């Protein structure tokens, strides 16, 4: 057969993948799909969104050239956006309805570009089967009467709750106090069949929830330099700079970085004097800065990229896992830990009664190294919350080039005055916001299906281009295990969501199959183009050599993505 005919035959598979993608997307929008709106649920301390001052409830109106984006458009827009010059976001502020455009530069510390935002949440607690609305060992789980799946929070203390933003603000404000949470719940009568045509009968319940104390081992680390400053914060107004290091507060040593925010909150609205070490090139200078701490408006999300949050100043500071002080009479003082020791990794050791518990997250058998996977603030302020009583932590300690293991119990964290230090998290699990989107007509479904198919095809192309440019790591790809996991998640929301996922998968196959790699249709197309130009086929020896090279490449790639899926290769 002629070269054009063979090209048409080879292209048929790719064309069918595109057609199937279009058909599945069209059917999906005829059935209806669930979309997560592009609203900020929370920001990660030290991330680009946190630095720019984005807040829960802020709505993203535009990302680059994409109007009215969905949250998944934000995820792909950040991953595949301009990492060098940043990505343009048009935001409607929840605080005052003001619309503004900001440029956010994604952080790639964790391997995948991120701006540090979480998706929006309802005021309703999760109600998925097999999921509890409260974290185990949390104050919310211990509260009486108990929280139930599907409870909707309508009031906290005396504040009426209209959105998750209200909840977050109250949790931040009353972090160190008990709160009374009023929920609205559906009355379920035993033996009565469910009737979706009738408005369900509801009742209200007032539940008192205690604050969450932070944990401690008696290990004090040194406060490092400032690594992030929020726009519009007291720190920015006082001319603090990234790289500055706080040496003292009102003439007193900084002390434990984990208790500094608690001490600053006792001086809200009052001026304090900070002694600052400022570096400029090779020179170092000392200066005094006056700043007035302000009440934090929202809770903190601490991640590996985060330093310790000093929210009342609007800064985050680096804290390395190197021991500066071992407190007297603390668990660490009784064992072989000294100032100058570096903590290499940690491993949770749950009590024997909890080692087989599926719900207990501390039963992980792997040690977690500090670095890209974990920071000291994240470990202490997030990882140590909601653990089973009597859970110990095994520390790998490095001293003079040698390592040894130390196992420690934890105690409640107290500041220099003996006051307990609390986290703003109470252990409540909120349902994500989903909006149901269904085409108004068949022509509308065709239009949406066409756009979904084009977006999926371009997504694969842009992802591959970013990998080639080195802006997205190869560890961002997923294999069969990851595909099955995401397909299962999509199927939980309905057949429409599953079809949208299959649209993306079919588009992936179309683009990948047409890459110029021997054994794939794209590789055969290259040989046919060569034959069409030269008027003769490539030599059999060349074809065999390239075919074996393509086989080795594909097998290596398959093993690599399988290793990522199974956790044998770290994604960070």
Language model feature labels by segment:
Residues 39-61:
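Short extracytoplasmic/periplasmic juxtamembrane "stem" segments immediately C-terminal to an N-terminal membrane anchor
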Residues 24, 28-33, 469-470, 492, ...:
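Short helix-capping/hinge motifs at transmembrane helix termini and TM-loop junctions
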Residues 1-22, 63-111, 156-212, 249-308, ...:
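Interdomain regulatory linker/hinge segments that flank or connect interaction modules
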Residues 1-47, 68, 124-125, 133-134, ...:
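Internal alpha-helical transmembrane segments
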Residues 1-5, 112-152, 160, 180, ...:
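Functional transmembrane alpha-helices
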Residues 55-62, 148-155, 241-248, 338-345:
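Short, well-structured beta-strand-loop connectors
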Residues 515-525:
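Transmembrane helix boundary and interhelical junction motifs in multipass membrane proteins
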């Amino acid at each position: 057969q002629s070269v054009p005919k063979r090209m048409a035959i080879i292209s048929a598979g790719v064309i069918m993948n595109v057609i199937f993608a279009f058909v599945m997307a069209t059917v999906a929008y005829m059935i209806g799909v669930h979309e997560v709106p592009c609203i900020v649920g929370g920001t990660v301390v030290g991330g680009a969104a946190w630095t720019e001052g984005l807040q829960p409830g802020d709505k993203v109106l535009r990302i680059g050239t994409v109007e009215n984006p969905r949250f998944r458009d934000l995820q792909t827009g950040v991953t595949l956006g301009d990492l060098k010059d940043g990505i343009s976001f048009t935001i409607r502020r929840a605080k005052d309805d003001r619309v503004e455009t900001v440029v956010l530069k994604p952080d790639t510390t964790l391997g995948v570009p991120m701006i540090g935002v979480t998706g929006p949440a309802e005021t309703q607690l999760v109600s998925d089967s097999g999921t509890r609305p409260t974290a185990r060992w949390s104050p919310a789980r211990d509260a009486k009467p108990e929280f139930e799946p599907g409870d909707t929070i309508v009031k906290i203390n005396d504040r009426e709750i209209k959105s998750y933003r209200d909840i977050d603000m109250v949790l931040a404000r009353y972090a160190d106090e008990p709160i009374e949470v009023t929920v609205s719940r559906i009355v379920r009568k035993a033996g009565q069949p469910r009737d979706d045509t009738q408005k369900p009968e509801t009742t209200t319940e007032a539940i008192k929830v205690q604050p969450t104390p932070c944990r401690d081992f008696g290990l004090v680390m040194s406060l490092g330099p400032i690594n992030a400053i929020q726009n519009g914060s007291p720190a920015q107004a006082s001319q603090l700079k990234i790289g500055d290091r706080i040496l003292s507060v009102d003439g007193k040593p900084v002390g434990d970085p984990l208790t500094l925010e608690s001490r600053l909150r006792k001086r809200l609205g009052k001026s304090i004097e900070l002694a600052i070490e400022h570096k400029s090139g090779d020179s170092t200078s000392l200066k005094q800065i006056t700043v007035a701490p302000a009440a934090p408006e929202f809770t903190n999300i601490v991640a590996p990229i985060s330093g310790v949050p000093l929210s009342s100043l609007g800064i985050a500071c680096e804290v390395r896992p190197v021991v500066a002080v071992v407190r007297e009479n603390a668990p660490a003082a009784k064992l072989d830990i000294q100032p100058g020791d570096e903590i290499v990794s940690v491993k949770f050791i749950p009590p024997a009664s909890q080692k087989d518990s599926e719900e207990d997250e501390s039963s992980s058998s792997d040690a977690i190294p500090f670095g890209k996977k974990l920071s000291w603030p994240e470990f202490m302020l997030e990882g140590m919350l909601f653990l089973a009583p009597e859970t110990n932590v095994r520390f790998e300690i490095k001293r003079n080039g040698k390592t040894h293991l130390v196992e420690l119990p934890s105690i409640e964290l107290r500041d220099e005055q003996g006051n307990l230090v609390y986290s703003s998290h109470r252990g409540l699990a909120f349902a994500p916001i989903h909006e149901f989107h269904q085409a108004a007509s068949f022509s509308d479904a065709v239009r949406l299906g066409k756009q979904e198919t084009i977006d999926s095809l371009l997504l694969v192309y842009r992802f591959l281009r970013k990998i080639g440019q080195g802006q997205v790591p190869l560890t961002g790809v997923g294999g069969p295990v990851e595909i099955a996991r995401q397909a299962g998640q999509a199927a939980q929301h309905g057949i429409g969501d599953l079809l949208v996922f299959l649209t993306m998968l079919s588009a992936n196959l179309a683009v990948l199959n047409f890459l110029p790699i021997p054994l794939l249709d794209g590789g055969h197309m290259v040989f046919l183009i060569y034959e069409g130009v030269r008027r003769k086929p490539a030599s059999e020896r060349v074809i065999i050599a390239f075919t074996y090279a393509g086989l080795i490449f594909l097998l290596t790639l398959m093993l690599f993505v399988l290793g990522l899926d199974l956790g044998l290769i770290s994604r960070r």
